[in-house]
């Protein structure tokens, strides 16, 4: 089945927000990593065979405009809640990838009854166990940071090939936005764990067993914080599960969302 994807620009909070949309069925909002979004991933196509898939570029990332006032993932969460209201879609499920998982968790905490389901994949936003840390982009190169998110370096090469100048520039911008919105404390919220207990949406936590960016202990913390959450660990998989193990992640997500 060939999925038709459309690209539009929405004006939200004075920001030109780029939105890719495809498929049909119940709505699913997919929120991308801190390194930005790769267009037309097989994972997205698999979701779009069952769902109406919405993939925005975070404000300041990719093709979306940078708001000078943006300072936190919670700001981005509010923008996306506004986007969904303008699109007049309801009963939306959220899939958050890495940094996007943090945003999805913030959305769910702000509107505990509004979302049909929550899938967090290697999500930032919660502090790992004592002695463990979320990988710091500031101390590695633009290429080494995304590479470290793959269990198998061949998977990185399959997605990115020979890294272009345009890609390096996109990672540079993404890194700047990550620092602007998640610097102190770095990549986690001191308040979020205390606010997730009110979330009514069923939640699935997915983690790669070799995630070297966000430690597995953060996933376990999410599973404890979200009432009744299920957790699955994907073998031979790093942080970027949607790129490294698209079939496995798509099956997990589709099976979970189809039960809701």
Mark where each language-model region is.
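Short beta-strand/loop motif that positions the catalytic acidic residue
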Residues: 199, 205-207, 211
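Conserved HGGG/HGGXW glycine-rich cap/lid loop of the alpha/beta-hydrolase fold
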Residues: 11-65
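Conserved alpha/beta-hydrolase "acid-adjacent" motif
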Residues: 212-218
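Catalytic active-site module of serine/aspartate enzymes centered on a nucleophile-bearing elbow/loop
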Residues: 229-260
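Acidic beta-to-alpha connecting loop that harbors the catalytic carboxylate
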Residues: 24, 34, 209-211, 236-238
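Conserved alpha/beta-hydrolase catalytic His-Asp/Glu region
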Residues: 129-135, 143-201
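Flexible "cap/lid" loop of the alpha/beta hydrolase fold
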Residues: 102-110, 115-147
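Active-site loop/oxyanion-hole signature of alpha/beta-hydrolase fold enzymes
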Residues: 54-95, 251
């Amino acid at each position: 089945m060939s999925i038709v994807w459309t690209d539009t620009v929405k004006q939200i909070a004075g920001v030109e927000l780029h939105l890719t949309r495809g498929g049909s069925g119940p709505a699913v909002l997919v929120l991308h990593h801190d390194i930005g979004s790769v267009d037309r991933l097989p994972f997205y196509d698999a979701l779009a065979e069952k769902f109406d898939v919405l993939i925005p570029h975070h404000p300041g990332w990719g093709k979306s405009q940078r708001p000078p006032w943006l300072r936190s993932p919670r700001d981005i969460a509010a923008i996306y809640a506004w986007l969904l209201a303008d699109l007049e879609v309801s009963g939306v499920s959220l899939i958050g990838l890495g940094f996007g998982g943090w945003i999805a968790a913030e959305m769910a905490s702000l509107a505990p009854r509004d979302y049909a389901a929550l899938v967090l994949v290697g999500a930032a936003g919660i502090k790992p166990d004592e002695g463990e840390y979320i990988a710091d982009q500031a101390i590695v190169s633009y290429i080494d940071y995304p590479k470290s998110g793959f269990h198998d370096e061949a998977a990185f090469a399959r997605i990115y090939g020979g890294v272009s100048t345009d890609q390096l520039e996109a990672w540079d911008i993404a890194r700047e936005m990550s620092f602007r919105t998640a610097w102190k404390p770095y990549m986690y919220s001191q308040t979020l764990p205390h606010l997730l207990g009110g979330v009514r949406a069923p939640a699935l936590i997915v983690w790669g067993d070799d995630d070297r960016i966000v430690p597995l202990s953060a996933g376990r913390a999410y599973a404890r914080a979200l009432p009744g959450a299920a957790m699955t660990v994907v073998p031979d998989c790093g942080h970027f599960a949607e790129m490294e193990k698209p079939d496995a992640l798509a099956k997990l997500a589709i099976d979970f969302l189809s039960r809701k």
